C-alpha cells in the first residue's frame, strides 16, 4: 500500500492544478474529452497535453503518439513558439509536467 501511495504522490506532483491551466487550453482539453466520450475507440485516448519550462516561461505541447503528432509549443496565451527558437527550445526545455492525460496515455 505504501508503494502505491508513493507512486500516486509522485504522479500528483507532475500534474498541474486546474488553476494553472490557461483558458485556451481548457477549451482544447474539453474538446478532446468530448471526442473521447463520443467515440471511445478514437486514437485520441492515447494523447496528452504537457507543459515545459524554457527561458523562465511555460510552453504547452500536445502529444498524440499513435498519429506520430506533436504540436508546436504554445506559450501561456496560446501563441506558437517562433520557428527560429524551436531548436534551442528543444535542447534547453525542462521540467515536463502533465497538464492532461487521455485515458490510455
Q: Which role does the model predict for each range below?
A:
Residues 15-43:
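Short, non-transmembrane alpha-helical segments in secretory-pathway proteins
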Amino acid at each position: 500500500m505504501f508503494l502505491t501511495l508513493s507512486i500516486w504522490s509522485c504522479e500528483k506532483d507532475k500534474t498541474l492544478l486546474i488553476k494553472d491551466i490557461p483558458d485556451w487550453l481548457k477549451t482544447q482539453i474539453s474538446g478532446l474529452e468530448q471526442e473521447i466520450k463520443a467515440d471511445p475507440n478514437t486514437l485520441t485516448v492515447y494523447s496528452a497535453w504537457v507543459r515545459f519550462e524554457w527561458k523562465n516561461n511555460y510552453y504547452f505541447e500536445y502529444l498524440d503518439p499513435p498519429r506520430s503528432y506533436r504540436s508546436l509549443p504554445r506559450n501561456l496565451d496560446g501563441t506558437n513558439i517562433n520557428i527560429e527558437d524551436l531548436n534551442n527550445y528543444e535542447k534547453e526545455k525542462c521540467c515536463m509536467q502533465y497538464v492532461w492525460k487521455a485515458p490510455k496515455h
